[in-house]
A protein has these predicted regions:
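P-loop NTPase nucleotide-binding core
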Residues: 1-153
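Conserved P-loop NTPase "ATPase switch" module shared by AAA+ and STAND
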Residues: 154-174
Length: 175
């Protein structure tokens, strides 16, 4: 399992602001290999797994064939994500293209946008063909996209702990 804990509070991470809950969950994402901040590790591991699957098919070891077959496999696996969240899929494609091109700043920005970070440069979002920030409505779709990536990467799922103890301590007991 991948695991994440989100501290729910009235001011910093209210439960009704799903975009904030999603962002905090991605910031605290942990796996067995990476304690905190495993979001990029999960993405990179998923793309690596695609290439490993292509190599296991025996599709050829030259770079051009590997890249072409990896792109085809990427599109097959992104089909479900694309139907649910086209922006998530577009940003994943652009992230991979930036990684391949050695454009680490764009890749970093897109990983930030995919994880719900609000202050990503417009030029980076434009490179992926996406607009705006991850909002309340997109947050659950993005979470669904992450779950598909986790499943495809061999994880059993995501254990998400929503800790509301701070909020509950302020609730009046005499009501």
């Amino acid at each position: 399992f991948a695991v994440s804990e989100v501290q729910i509070s009235e001011t910093e991470t209210p439960l009704h602001r799903l975009e904030m809950v999603y962002r905090r969950a991605m910031e605290g994402l942990s796996t067995a290999d990476c304690f905190l901040g495993a979001f990029r590790s999960v993405l990179d591991g998923w793309f690596y797994g695609l290439e490993e699957d292509v190599l296991a098919e025996g599709a050829g070891a030259d770079e051009t064939t590997l890249a072409r077959r990896s792109d085809e496999l990427l599109e097959q696996r992104l089909a479900e994500i694309t139907r649910a969240t086209p922006q998530f899929a577009a940003a994943l494609r652009a992230y991979r293209a930036a990684q391949r091109a050695g454009d680490h700043a764009t890749a970093e920005g897109l990983a930030g946008w995919l994880s719900g970070q609000p202050n990503v440069a417009a030029s980076i979002k434009r490179a992926a063909g996406v607009k705006g920030d991850v909002d309340h409505f997109a947050a659950l779709s993005f979470l669904r996209g992450l779950l598909l990536i986790l499943k495809d990467s061999g994880f059993s799922g995501l254990a998400l702990v929503l800790d509301e103890i701070e909020t509950l301590q302020r609730v009046r007991g005499d009501v």
